[in-house]
Structures are given as C-alpha cells and as structure tokens.
C-alpha cells in the first residue's frame, strides 16, 4: 500500500514574505584557525591532558564521615555532642510533654499599662 501525502486545505489569506535578513557572504569563511593561535604550540596531547587530570585528583580524598547521620553535630544546643537518633520520639509518643525551647522567642508584652 503506497502512502500518499495528504493535502492540507488552508483557509484564509496568506502571503509569502521575503526573508528580511539578507545572506552576508563572509570573506573569512576559509580561515585556517591554526594560523590564528597565539602561541602556535598548544599542547593538546593525551599525555598533557592526563597530567592535568592527575594534578586535579592528587588532592586528599574527601572525608565522607560528615555524611554519616551518626556523626551529625548541631552547632548551637548540642555543640560537640553526637546526636543519638535512637532516642527520637516516635509519632504520637509524648507529644504533649515535648516542648522545644526557642532561643529567639520573645514573649508578648502586656500593653494594658
């Protein structure tokens, strides 16, 4: 079965507009970029690229101990103390007795004076 392209009927008025951006013939199309290099002696060899890679990766390995949740430290209330995640309140347990003190909380003042 041969597929014929479907013809689309376009209703309304339309007109073709000439391309308003003229084609500019660049005279510099055939430029040799090797001649334009400033030093003329760029070292793109695999050896130099490997040296750059090795220089970057010669640093000390990252310390991933901070990512371990058992090593998380708080900077204010529990300074230099490890957080014990085994004592976290379970949902619905002692919610009424648990109040967190807010260091920045300022109680409202009576304005009846």
From Swiss-Prot:
It is found in: Cytoplasm; Nucleus. The keyword Chaperone applies. Its main location: cytoplasm. Residues 1-18 have a biased composition (Basic and acidic residues). Keywords: Chaperone, Cytoplasm, Nucleus. It holds the Pfam family CHZ. Residues 20-33, 41-65, 92-105 have a biased composition (Acidic residues). GO terms for molecular function: H2A-H2B histone complex chaperone activity. InterPro entries: Histone_chaperone_domain_CHZ. Residues 1-71, 83-113 are annotated as: Disordered. Signal peptide: none annotated. One of its GO terms (cellular component) is nucleus. One of its GO terms (biological process) is chromatin remodeling. It comes from the Eukaryota. Forms a heterotrimer with H2A.Z-H2B, stabilizing the association of the histone dimer. Forms a chaperone-bound H2A.Z-H2B complex that acts as a source for SWR1 complex-dependent H2A to H2A.Z histone replacement in chromatin. Belongs to the CHZ1 family. This is Histone H2A.Z-specific chaperone chz1.
């Amino acid at each position: 079965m041969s597929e014929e392209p479907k013809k689309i009927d376009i209703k309304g008025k339309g007109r073709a507009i000439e391309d308003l951006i003229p084609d500019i013939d660049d005279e510099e199309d055939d430029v040799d970029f090797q001649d334009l290099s400033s030093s003329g002696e760029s070292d793109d060899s695999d050896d130099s690229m490997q040296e750059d890679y090795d220089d970057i990766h010669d640093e000390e390995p990252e310390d991933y101990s901070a990512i371990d949740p058992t090593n998380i430290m708080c900077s204010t209330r529990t300074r230099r103390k490890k957080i014990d995640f085994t004592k976290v309140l379970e949902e619905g347990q002692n919610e009424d007795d648990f109040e967190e003190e807010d260091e920045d909380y300022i109680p409202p003042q009576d304005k009846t004076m």
